[in-house]
């Protein structure tokens, strides 16, 4: 691959101090959901780090509610990119006001049907 076609992916600092989120899906027979999420923000963006820390409880509450509104079908691995984008956009639009997260990654994700 020639150099001009190589896209350098931006690297991020990661906020990893969110608690593990545990909830149930919205299916008629709910499944258990357990996720651990890391939020990526621009390197050296102290404002993002500070605001995420200040709004940590709101973010955890949002994530718990978000996953409790999903179905097992919604949470399938092939939908993870969409879920990550939805989480990023909703945190940026509804929770953060002075900064932006750039990426969301699952560091753990289990969906267990009863």
Across the structure, where does each feature detected by a protein language model lie?
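Flexible, low-complexity charged segments
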Residues: 1-114
